[in-house]
C-alpha cells in the first residue's frame, strides 16, 4: 500500500521526469559540431609559380643548351617519383597553360644570353658588290638522270660572291674583303643586280653567334619548387581540354627538347595509340591545329657542299666568320623521307580530320605565303638554318574512296640555307649564324604537324583545305606541355567534428620535420576524408619533402655560376624557387601558430560549425567525400573560418594571460617575496587612508546632525550618557538613588590611538559578522545536506519500487508467455493425436461403411 501511495503521489513528478529525459535524448542527438584544423591534407589549387629546370647536361659540352643547362639547371633525379591519384578527376586546358608562356620566355632568354658576348655586325651594314657564283659543274649527273637530280643543282644566283670594305685592326684604315653570301641573306639596293646590303641591316642589330656554339638542343625537365606539384594527365586519347580521369603527380616534366622549327614538329613525344588532333576551337579557321603522330617519320637532311670558313677582321678585337670557298661541286641542301610512311601518316591525319569535319573531303596544300620561316619548313641542322620547301608533302586530297598515289619511293625536299635569321619574329633582333665547315648531315623524327584550315567558299564544296603553319614557338612547346598543369599544395584543411577544445594551455613550438618526397602524400587524394589509409603524420612530414634536397641542388647550380660573376635566367629562377619554398612553409606554420596549433596535425578549436557553410552530416562528409571535394564545398567560406579561428585563439590567449596572472598567488611563500612588499605597503596605506577618511566623514555628519538639533560640537571622543527611561529616576543628593550605570565608550587621546581604536573596532565588527555568516552558511549546508539525503533516500526507494514492479511485470510476462506456449503446444499435440487416430481408423471406417451398404 505504501508503494501504491508513493506512485500515486509522485505520478506527476514521473511524467515531468520522462519529458526531461526525452528532451535530453533529443539534445544529445542534435550534438554541436566544432571546427577542427587538419594539417597535411591532400588538397591542391591551380597556380602559377616560378619553374626551374633539371638536365643531364655535362660541363664539357660546347653546345649552347648544354652549357646553359650545366651552369643553371640542377641534375635530374635518377629515380623520379610519379604518384598515381586514384579516384581523382581534374580539368586541364593546354591553351591556357602558364608553363607554355614560361618556356617561351626562357628559350628567348637562352638565345639572348648566348648572343650577349658575341660580336655585333654593325660594321658590315655597308654596300656589297656581289656577283653570282657559278653553280654548274662537269661532275653533275648526265642528261638521262636530270629529272631525278634537278634538285642537286643549286639555282643560279642562290650563292653570291660579295666584296666590301671593312675596318682593319687600325681604325683609320680600310681593307677590301671577299665573302660568300646566300641569296636569302642579302637585298638589292635600288633594284640593282650588283649592289646589295645585308638583310635586316636597317631594322635590327645583327649579332654573330659565337663560333664554338651549335644549336642542337638537349632535353630539359621543368620542375616545381617545394610546396607545388605538377599534375599529369595520362589519358591516351586526351584532346588537351576538359576533364582527365587518369591523373598522376610528378615533380618534373619529361625531357623536352627545345626544338625551334615551323610546320613540322621534330623530336617530340608521340601519341600512345592513335593520331590525335588538338585545337582550341575547330570551328574557327584562325585557330591552329596541332597534330600529334603515333609513329614518327624519319627525315634525313644534308648539306653536301664542303665549305671552308674564313675569318675577317672588322675592327680591333672583332672578327667576322664567313664562307671562304666551296670545295668540289656546289649542290643544293635537301631532306629525304619515305613516301610510303608519309602517305600513311597523312591518311591517318585525314581520317581524324574527316571525323571532326563531318566526313568532308580533306585536302592538303602548300603554305599560302608570308615570311620564309612560315612558307618553308625552317629548322637548325648541325648549326646551319635550313629552309625547306614542303609543297611535295602537302599536295594531296583524301576522301573515302580515293587517295594520292605515286611511284616514287623517296620524297626529296629542296632546302635553302639562311645565315641571317630573324629570331622569334621580333623586330630589332637578328642573328648571323657562322658557316659550318665541311659537310652537314642530320637526322630527325617528325612527331607532329602544325596546320591551319582555309575558310571561305571552298568549304561549301565539301572540301576542307589544310595548310602547314607555324611561326609561334608557343605551339611547339604546347605540343609537349599539353598534359601538364601546375598546382599549389594547400596542406591546411578545416572540417566539422564533435571534438571541442576544452583546456586552455600554452603550445610549444615544434621543429619542422623532414621527409623524402613531398609528392607522396598526394597519393591519398582519392581516398575519403575518414579513410584509415590516410595518415596525416606521414603526409605532414612529406610536406617538407624535397625542400632540403632541392635547396642543396639549387645551391650547387648557383655556385657553379659564381665564377662567371653572372646569373642566367635559370639562376634567378632558382633563387626565386628557394625563397618561395621556404615562404610557403613558413606561411602555413605562421597560420598554425596564430591558431594555437603549432606542432599539431589535428587541432580542435572553440569555433562552432555553422550549418550555412555546409549542412552535410558527419557521415556524408567523412565517409563519402574526398578532401578535394570538401575543399570545393567550403571554398567560399574558408577565409571566414580562418578569421573566426584567429579571433577565438586571441580570446583564448587573453583568458590564458589572465589565468597566468593568478599563478603568482599559487604558493604561500611567494606572499612574502620582497618584490611584493611595496605592494603590501601600498595596500596598507590605502586601507588606513580609507578608514581615516570614513571616520572624518562620519564625524562631520555627526556634527552636522547635532548642530541641527541645537547642540554645540564636542570632542570627537566624548561619549554622551545614554538617556534613561521614565521608570529609572536619577540619583539624589543623599545618595538614595541608583548608582550611575550609564555606558560610555572609552576615551583616547592622540591620532595614532584614534586610528588604532577605529581599526580594532573594525576588526571586531568584521570578525563578528564573518562568524555569523559562517554559522548561517553551516546551518544552510546542514539543512541542504539533510534534505538532500532525504531526497536521495526517496529516489532510492522509488528506484527499488520501480525495479520490483519491472521485475514483477517481466515475471508476469514470462509466465503468460509460458502458459500461452504450453497451451499452444497442447493444442498442437492434441491435433496431431486426432489426425493420427483418424488415420488409424480409416480401415475401420471403410469396413463400417461396407457393412452399412450391405445391410
From Swiss-Prot:
Lipidation (S-palmitoyl cysteine) at which residues?
A: 763
Q: Matching Pfam families, A to Z? A: GP120 (PF00516), GP41 (PF00517)
Q: Where is this region: V2?
A: 162-201
* GO aspect biological process, one term: positive regulation of receptor clustering
Region: Fusion peptide; residue ranges are: 510-531
CDD domains, alphabetized: HIV-1-like_HR1-HR2 (cd09909)
Which is an annotated GO molecular function term of this record? Answer: structural molecule activity
Q: Would you list which residues are glycosylated? A: 87, 134, 142, 145, 161, 165, 192, 202, 239, 246, 267, 281, 294, 300, 306, 336, 359, 389, 395, 399, 405, 458, 610, 615, 624, 636
For this protein, the parts annotated as crossing the membrane are: 684-704
Coiled-coil segments: 632-666
Q: Which InterPro entries match?
A: Gp120_core_sf (IPR036377), Gp160 (IPR037527), GP41-like (IPR000328), HIV1_Gp120 (IPR000777)
Renumbered residue ranges of the record's region V1:
130-161
Q: What are the record's GO terms for cellular component?
A: host cell endosome membrane; host cell plasma membrane; membrane; viral envelope; virion membrane
Q: Which ranges sit in the Extracellular compartment?
A: 32-683
Q: Where is this region: MPER?
A: 661-682
Cytoplasmic compartment spans: 705-855
Keywords for the protein's UniProt record, in alphabetical order: AIDS, Apoptosis, Clathrin-mediated endocytosis of virus by host, Cleavage on pair of basic residues, Coiled coil, Disulfide bond, Fusion of virus membrane with host endosomal membrane, Fusion of virus membrane with host membrane, Glycoprotein, Host cell membrane, Host endosome, Host membrane, Host-virus interaction, Lipoprotein, Membrane, Palmitate, Signal, Transmembrane, Transmembrane helix, Viral attachment to host cell, Viral envelope protein, Viral immunoevasion, Viral penetration into host cytoplasm, Virion, Virus endocytosis by host, Virus entry into host cell
| Region entry V4, spans | 388-415
| Family, per entry | Belongs to the HIV-1 env protein family.
Additional notes on this entry: Inhibitors targeting HIV-1 viral envelope proteins are used as antiretroviral drugs. Attachment of virions to the cell surface via non-specific interactions and CD4 binding can be blocked by inhibitors that include cyanovirin-N, cyclotriazadisulfonamide analogs, PRO 2000, TNX 355 and PRO 542. In addition, BMS 806 can block CD4-induced conformational changes. Env interactions with the coreceptor molecules can be targeted by CCR5 antagonists including SCH-D, maraviroc (UK 427857) and aplaviroc (GW 873140), and the CXCR4 antagonist AMD 070. HIV-1 lineages are divided in three main groups, M (for Major), O (for Outlier), and N (for New, or Non-M, Non-O). The vast majority of strains found worldwide belong to the group M. Group O seems to be endemic to and largely confined to Cameroon and neighboring countries in West Central Africa, where these viruses represent a small minority of HIV-1 strains. The group N is represented by a limited number of isolates from Cameroonian persons. The group M is further subdivided in 9 clades or subtypes (A to D, F to H, J and K).
- Supply the name of the protein: Envelope glycoprotein gp160
Amino acid at each position: 500500500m505504501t508503494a501504491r501511495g508513493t506512485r500515486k503521489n509522485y505520478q506527476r513528478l514521473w511524467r515531468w521526469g520522462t519529458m526531461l529525459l526525452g528532451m535530453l535524448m533529443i539534445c544529445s542527438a542534435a550534438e554541436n559540431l566544432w571546427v577542427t584544423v587538419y594539417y597535411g591534407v591532400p588538397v591542391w589549387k591551380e597556380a602559377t609559380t616560378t619553374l626551374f629546370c633539371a638536365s643531364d647536361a655535362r660541363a664539357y659540352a660546347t653546345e649552347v643548351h648544354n652549357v646553359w643547362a650545366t651552369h643553371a639547371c640542377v641534375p635530374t633525379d635518377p629515380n623520379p617519383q610519379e604518384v598515381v591519384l586514384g579516384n581523382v578527376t581534374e580539368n586541364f586546358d593546354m591553351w591556357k597553360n602558364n608553363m607554355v608562356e614560361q618556356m617561351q620566355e626562357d628559350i628567348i632568354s637562352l638565345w639572348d644570353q648566348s648572343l650577349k658576348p658575341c660580336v655585333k655586325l654593325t660594321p658590315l651594314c655597308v654596300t656589297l658588290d656581289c656577283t653570282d657564283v657559278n653553280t654548274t659543274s662537269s661532275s653533275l649527273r648526265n642528261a638521262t638522270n636530270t629529272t631525278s637530280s634537278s634538285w642537286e643543282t643549286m639555282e643560279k644566283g642562290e650563292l653570291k660572291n660579295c666584296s666590301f670594305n671593312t675596318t682593319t685592326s687600325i681604325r683609320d684604315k680600310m681593307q677590301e674583303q671577299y665573302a660568300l653570301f646566300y641569296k636569302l641573306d642579302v637585298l638589292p639596293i635600288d633594284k640593282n643586280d650588283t649592289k646589295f646590303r645585308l638583310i635586316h641591316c636597317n631594322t635590327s642589330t645583327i649579332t654573330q653567334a659565337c663560333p664554338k656554339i651549335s644549336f642542337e638542343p638537349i632535353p630539359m625537365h621543368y620542375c616545381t619548387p617545394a610546396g607545388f606539384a605538377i599534375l599529369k594527365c595520362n589519358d591516351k586519347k586526351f584532346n588537351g581540354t576538359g576533364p582527365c580521369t587518369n591523373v598522376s603527380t610528378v615533380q618534373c616534366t619529361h625531357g623536352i627538347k627545345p626544338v625551334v622549327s615551323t610546320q613540322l614538329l621534330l623530336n617530340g613525344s608521340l601519341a600512345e595509340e592513335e593520331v590525335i588532333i588538338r585545337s582550341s576551337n575547330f570551328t574557327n579557321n584562325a585557330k591552329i591545329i596541332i597534330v600529334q603522330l603515333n609513329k614518327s617519320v624519319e627525315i634525313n637532311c644534308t648539306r653536301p657542299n664542303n665549305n671552308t670558313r674564313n675569318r675577317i677582321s672588322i675592327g680591333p678585337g672583332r672578327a667576322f666568320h664567313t664562307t671562304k670557298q666551296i670545295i668540289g661541286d656546289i649542290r643544293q641542301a635537301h631532306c629525304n623521307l619515305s613516301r610510303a610512311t608519309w602517305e600513311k601518316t597523312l591518311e591517318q591525319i585525314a581520317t581524324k580530320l574527316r571525323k571532326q569535319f563531318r566526313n568532308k573531303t580533306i585536302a592538303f596544300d602548300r603554305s599560302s605565303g608570308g615570311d620564309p620561316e612560315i612558307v618553308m619548313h625552317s629548322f637548325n641542322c648541325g648549326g646551319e638554318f635550313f629552309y625547306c620547301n614542303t609543297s611535295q608533302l602537302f599536295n594531296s586530297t583524301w576522301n573515302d574512296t580515293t587517295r594520292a598515289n605515286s611511284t616514287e619511293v623517296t620524297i626529296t625536299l629542296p632546302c635553302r640555307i639562311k645565315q641571317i635569321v630573324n629570331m622569334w619574329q621580333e623586330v630589332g633582333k637578328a642573328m648571323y649564324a657562322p658557316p659550318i665547315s665541311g659537310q652537314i648531315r642530320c637526322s630527325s623524327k617528325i612527331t607532329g604537324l602544325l596546320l591551319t584550315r582555309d575558310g571561305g567558299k571552298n568549304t561549301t564544296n565539301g572540301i576542307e583545305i589544310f595548310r602547314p603553319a607555324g611561326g609561334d614557338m608557343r605551339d611547339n612547346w604546347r605540343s609537349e606541355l599539353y598534359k601538364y598543369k601546375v598546382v599549389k599544395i594547400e596542406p591546411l584543411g578545416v572540417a566539422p567534428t564533435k571534438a571541442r577544445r576544452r583546456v586552455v594551455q600554452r603550445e610549444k613550438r615544434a621543429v619542422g620535420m623532414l621527409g623524402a618526397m613531398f609528392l607522396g602524400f598526394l597519393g591519398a587524394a582519392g581516398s575519403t576524408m575518414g579513410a584509415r589509409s590516410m595518415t596525416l603524420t606521414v603526409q605532414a612530414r612529406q610536406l617538407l619533402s624535397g625542400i632540403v634536397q632541392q635547396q642543396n641542388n639549387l645551391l650547387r647550380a648557383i655556385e657553379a655560376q659564381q665564377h662567371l660573376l653572372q646569373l642566367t635566367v635559370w639562376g634567378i629562377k632558382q633563387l626565386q624557387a628557394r625563397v618561395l619554398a621556404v615562404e610557403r612553409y613558413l606561411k602555413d606554420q605562421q597560420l598554425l601558430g596564430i591558431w594555437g596549433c603549432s606542432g599539431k596535425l589535428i587541432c580542435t578549436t572553440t569555433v562552432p560549425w555553422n550549418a550555412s557553410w555546409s549542412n552535410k552530416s558527419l557521415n556524408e562528409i567523412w565517409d563519402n567525400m574526398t578532401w578535394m571535394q570538401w575543399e570545393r564545398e567550403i571554398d567560399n567560406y574558408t577565409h571566414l573560418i580562418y578569421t573566426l579561428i584567429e579571433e577565438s585563439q586571441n580570446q583564448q590567449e587573453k583568458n590564458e594571460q589572465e589565468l597566468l596572472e593568478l599563478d603568482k598567488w599559487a604558493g604561500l611563500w611567494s606572499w612574502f617575496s620582497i618584490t611584493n612588499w611595496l605592494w603590501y605597503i601600498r595596500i596598507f596605506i590605502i586601507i588606513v587612508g580609507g578608514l581615516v577618511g570614513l571616520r572624518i566623514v562620519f564625524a562631520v555628519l555627526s556634527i552636522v546632525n547635532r548642530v541641527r538639533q541645537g547642540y554645540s560640537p564636542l570632542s570627537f571622543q566624548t561619549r554622551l550618557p545614554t538617556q534613561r527611561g521614565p521608570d529609572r529616576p536619577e540619583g539624589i543628593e543623599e545618595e538614595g538613588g541608583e548608582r550611575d550605570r550609564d555606558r560610555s565608550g572609552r576615551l583616547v587621546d592622540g591620532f595614532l590611538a584614534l586610528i588604532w581604536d577605529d581599526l580594532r573596532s573594525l576588526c571586531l565588527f568584521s570578525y563578528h559578522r564573518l562568524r555569523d555568516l559562517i554559522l548561517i552558511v553551516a546551518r544552510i549546508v546542514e539543512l541542504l545536506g539533510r534534505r538532500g539525503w532525504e531526497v536521495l533516500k526517496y529516489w532510492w526507494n522509488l528506484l527499488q519500487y520501480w525495479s520490483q514492479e519491472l521485475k514483477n511485470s517481466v515475471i508476469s510476462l514470462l509466465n503468460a508467455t509460458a502458459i500461452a506456449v504450453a497451451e499452444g503446444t497442447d493444442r498442437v499435440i492434441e491435433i496431431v493425436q486426432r489426425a493420427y487416430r483418424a488415420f488409424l481408423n480409416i480401415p475401420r471406417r471403410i469396413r463400417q461403411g461396407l457393412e452399412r451398404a450391405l445391410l
